[in-house]
Amino acid sequence: MILIKALLVLRKDNKKDRKSIEELKELAEVLYEVEGTYIQIRKPDSKYQIGEGFVKKLSKIVKDKNIDIVIFGNTLTPTQKYNLAKEFKVEVIDKIELVLRIFSKHAKTKEAQLQVKLAELQYELPRAKEKVRLAKQGEQPGFGGYGDYEVEKYYQKIKREIKSIKNKLEKLKEHRKILRKRREKYDSVGLVGYTNAGKTSLLNALTGENKEAKNQVFTTLTTTTRRIRGIKRKILITDTVGFMDDLPPFMIEAFLSTIEESANNDLILLVVDASEDIKEIERKLIVNHEILEKINCKSQIITVLNKVDKIDEKKKLEILNELDRYLINPIFVSAKYNINIEKLKKMILDNLNLSIGTIETDNPKLISYLYENTEILEDIEENDKHIITFRAKEKDVNRILKIHKIET
């Protein structure tokens, strides 16, 4: 296997800038061999994004280390990319392009592939005219000989492709609505959180399944829905694409239906990697809540602080005390070692806003329905009738009691 050597560069506005070189490294390592990371604190330079002196310094490092690709943690304009590639004499991409390449690698289903293509085209659209302008100057490979008419044709071609993909995704969304309608009789729990927080491992722990969980970012792009085991109620849990800082609006839009599948549930499990540095946990919690707010998530939340097996009591107290304002119904668990998983299941039940109803009936169809669709708490046989106490969603309890009242 040929290793492609990468150099990582990040420009920060100031020391308080929350952009993370560690996160960029974690992303890059999915596809490349990282040879070095470099940070510069300064205001953005219109020509290079970073300062010209820093560019010269990095050019020498690229040559000396035989670097194949330079990856920026900042969004680059086509002109900046061209200027940097001219100086480094290797390919230059930014963080968004890197994420799109990772998405492309992991997109296995038709929907995921369409979502990735949509994100790629929406990334390309505002850059199209500038890329063609460079081509007209003979400075952009693959775009030679473009006139004004061709520029507009290229731009309109991208817009048509975007429209076509959106139509295809809309049809898939309608199919998803049908599936969701079928599942409405079940309680639903969504797994959300920063990429690589351990959502898939938690899914396995709660469902008793063994979906492959890699220690790598963005391995889950499609939704996976399973039934939680060890609970009498039929509760479905859905895992989907992880969140990330600096995700542009077009990327959230491309994966909106997938994100909504997890976010619009009766209950949300917001999964956090508790083993990380306290500042990193805070940064990711802020991102999580920002994205949930963007998609107008109104669901009840349990904050699941995963990987508790890697931290001590002091760290647990530090998290609870310093990050209290971000923690909604917190619980420490280890999905890997099943620590506090049963306690989490109880919390799930307690936070589903369920109601309890009691009916007296001798109707076998109703009895069968209750056993299939609700959680039976008690069933007492008396005078050839069943006095059944059951638990379900409040609207379902009210509906069952109303129907039973009409029948009697």
Task: For the regions a language model picked out, list residue spans one by one.
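C-terminal-of-GTPase-core extension/linker across diverse P-loop GTPases
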Residues: 2-8, 125-197, 203, 293-408
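Short, acidic/turn-prone active-site loops that include or flank metal/cofactor-
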Residues: 96-100, 217-218, 335-336
